[in-house]
């Protein structure tokens, strides 16, 4: 029995939910999200609570049960409050700028890296070495953050690179003579 899947999702005020078989549409003050689920699950709405139940007793149905419940819960939180990720850029001369709909990264390469910003993600830059990402879809936000981090992941000797705000980088000792 899924400990996550059996919990009901309470729907806060200002959030509307539309169910069409396995398609869930959620709209709120921050925007609208929709997702179609595949698998052996049933989604029902009763008294301001959303319930997810498995249709079969096999391993795949139980796995999708908890996953679907977590995804729907994140969608509800996203349209109500939104999600925020903070990235730090460490290194001499490493910085970022937003130009139009592109994020321009200067990361000690022979060229600047341009990454197109998705339409549903907002970028704020209080400093040149801090990037704050905001959006309603937690999955897309994390995916975009990983694309940015992949351009220059943090290295263990000096800690240079792009990392999440409170991410701990295990440090290694350098060469000894």
From Swiss-Prot:
| GO biological process per UniProt | cytoplasmic translation
Indicate yes or no for the key word Transport: no
Alphabetized UniProt keyword annotations? Ribonucleoprotein, Ribosomal protein, RNA-binding, rRNA-binding
Q: Which GO terms describe its molecular function?
A: rRNA binding; structural constituent of ribosome
Tell me a GO cellular component.
ribonucleoprotein complex
Q: Does the keyword Transmembrane helix apply?
A: no
Q: Which Pfam families match?
A: Ribosomal_L6
Q: How does it assemble?
A: Part of the 50S ribosomal subunit.
Homology family: Belongs to the universal ribosomal protein uL6 family.
Functional description taken from the UniProt entry: This protein binds to the 23S rRNA, and is important in its secondary structure. It is located near the subunit interface in the base of the L7/L12 stalk, and near the tRNA binding site of the peptidyltransferase center.
Name listed for the protein in its UniProt record: Large ribosomal subunit protein uL6
The record lists the organism as Rickettsia conorii (strain ATCC VR-613 / Malish 7)
Gene this chain is encoded by:
rplF
